[in-house]
Amino acid sequence: MRDVDIPVENPGLVRWMLLLGQLGKPDTPEKEFLHEMYFYFFGQELLKSTFIIPMRTHGEIPEANENGVTSFKEGMTFDLAMVEGRDKEQALMFFTDWLRFRQKFGEEWQGLMQPLDGNLGLHDVIINGTGNPEAGAYITESIFNKIKEAHKKDA
């Protein structure tokens, strides 16, 4: 099965984001312990997740080849969904699944499937930026590098 044929779903990542959001800012040793545990598992899921990046093309998207790879024609332009960033000027919007993606962008936008790694050099990333901060995450390059370092021994 081609990677492109596998539905984009990240239930493990969504679970840990929701638990972190429900926990809020830890203000007791018990909550601090839970936060560290939740964040560890969040990082584990984050590293293996594939996301949907909202993309609006100006022109027709070519069909994918037999491997599921789409190559854009020379001169084709597209917009990526961005919002004002914290550490960097702009933040890219990433979604864990098509339901959350469509809730925010409807049918007018297409989705570009990407892992998080390699997308933080120029922009921060907002995961599931649907207006409910407790159900999403804001990822900077430094946070992502710390997560990768913490999980090196897991690989």
Regions found by a protein language model. Give the residues of each.
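An interfacial alpha-helical scaffold signature
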Residues: 1-155
